[in-house]
Amino acid sequence: IPKYIRNCGEMNIEVLPPCVNKSMKKFSVEDGKIRFGLMGVKNVGENAIDAIIKAREEKGVPRDIFTFIEQLDISQINKKAIESLIKAGACSCLAENKAALLDVYEGLVESAQNASRKNLAGQMSLFDIGGEEAAESLSAKLPEITPFSKDVSLAMEKEMLGVYITDHPLKDYAEKMRKVASITSEELNHAGENQEMDENSLAQGSLGQGSLDQSGADSASRIKDGMKAVMAGMVSSKRTLITKSNKMMAFIALEDLYGVSEVVV
């Protein structure tokens, strides 16, 4: 997905983040742009997505987090899904402050669940059956909380989507990285795929040419096994272990603007 998003950028096609008011289940076209689908958000199942789309189609596009949760069939969506949508930025159309949204969503979901349990017939709204207490809860204002920093917000986006959409934490360092790096993660990964493909082809008695795209072929011709290379990026994850010889070893996910490569140290 990161490669496709970058390719869209090179073709001046903007990829929009997921949005509870506009996204469909899968990727969709919106005014010549591509909108990220809700199925791409971690912890959000198909039933929850159906409930979100049905609510906005039948009851109108919600104006805030209070209306959003009030309109939902709360039996089809849980707290984890709402939390993931907020972290992914899919609720930014309701309020831009993720910290404030995360502060109130649990209480709103619990109120909606309590109201739903009281509503045995399943016909009345939360306002109808919850009285003044529910009405006050859903008409309240978001608390004044300091917004998350850009890096924290982007980290949440990456965690929930598996990719950066709105920005990239390394974007400001792109020029410096180009000056010191001799290889990108995309080139390195292509070279590895090409080597594995060649080995499989030789074992099967064929070369298997033409199966890689041009960028992969170019990378394979430039990168050779055993050569030294410099890759610039940030450590997105790390896993350490002790070898049989009692030495420390680590597997590091090194991420740049083009993807992720595993590094062993």
Q: Which residues make up each language-model segment?
A:
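Noncatalytic, beta-rich nucleic-acid-contacting surfaces in large DNA/RNA-processing enzymes
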Residues: 1-265
